[in-house]
Amino acid sequence: MADVVIVASAFGMDAVRAGGHAKWTSVSAAAGAGGFEVRRELFASDADASVEALRSLGNAMAKLGLWSVYSTPECLYTPEGVLDVYALRLALIEATALGARFVKLQLGGFAAHANAAAIAACVRGMSPRLVVENGQLEQGGSLAQFVGLFDALAREGHAGVLGMTFDVGNWLWRGVAPLDAAQQLAAHVEYVHCKTMNGEGTRRLASAPAADDAQFAAVLASLPPHVPRAIEFPFDATRIEADAAHYVAWLAAA
C-alpha cells in the first residue's frame, strides 16, 4: 500500500498562509497521512523559509510521525533552457533544513541539453531526492519535454540523477491524456499528485477524482504501485478533518 501525502494547499491557500503549515501537519497526522507537502509559495513571509524556521517545522513534523516534501514554484530550467543552478541549490538547502524526503521543482524551459553533470554535482551528498513536476503551463507541461529530459539525462550519463512528480490533473489541464503520459513516463515517476479537473477554460478547478473514475484508476495502475500518492485537491472547509481522513484511506487503497 502506497504512502499518502497531504499537500498543504488542500486545506486552502489562505488558511495556510494565515495560520502557518504547522497547524495543518497535525490535522494530516490525525487523518492517517504518512507525509505532508510544504509549499514555499504559501509561506506568510520569507522568514518562514529561513533555515531555523524550516528546521523547527521539520522537527515538529517528525514528532508527529510525518515525513515531508518541500515544494518550490521555481523552475529547474530558465525560459531559455538554461539550468538554473541558483534555484536548484537554494531549494536543496531549504529542503535539507526541513529534513525533506523530496524537493520538488517545476521543469521550466528545458529544450535539449539537460546539463546533467551540473545537476549531479548539486545533488551529490544531499539527502532530499530531486523531482520535477509537470505543470499547467505550456513550458514545463509538455509530454515531449519530459520524454526529452529523461532521454537527455541518460544520453549525458546521469540517468538516475532526478525523478518525476507525475501530476494527473495537470496533464488534463494541458489537454494530454494522463494514461498516455503514464505509459511513457512510468519508469521515472517517484511521486504522484492526485487530482482531476472540473470546469472549462480558465474556470477549471482541481477536485477529487470520483470513486468510480475509471481513467484515474487506470493511471494509478500504470504507475509504480509503491510510490507516494499526494492529495492535491481542496477539502470541504466545513468538514476538513473528516474529509482528510476519508481521502487518505481512499487513496491508500485505490
Please provide the spans of the model-predicted regions.
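Short secondary-structure boundary/capping segments within folded domains
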Residues: S26-S28, G58-M61
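Active-site-proximal loop/turn and secondary-structure-junction residues that shape catalytic pockets
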Residues: A10-G12, R40-L42, E74-L76, L107-A111, ...
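Active-site acidic/histidine proton-transfer and metal-coordination neighborhood
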Residues: N59-S68, P73-G163, W173, D243
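Flexible, glycine- and charge-enriched loops at secondary-structure boundaries
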Residues: D14, A18-H21, A47-S50, L54, ...
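Histidine-acidic metal/acid-base catalytic patches
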Residues: M1-G34, R89, I93-G99, L143-F166, ...
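Short, conserved active-site loops that position catalytic residues or coordinate cofactors/metal ions
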Residues: A31-E41, Y70-E74
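Glycine-rich, proline-tolerant flexible connector loops at the mouths of alpha/beta enzymes
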Residues: G35-A60
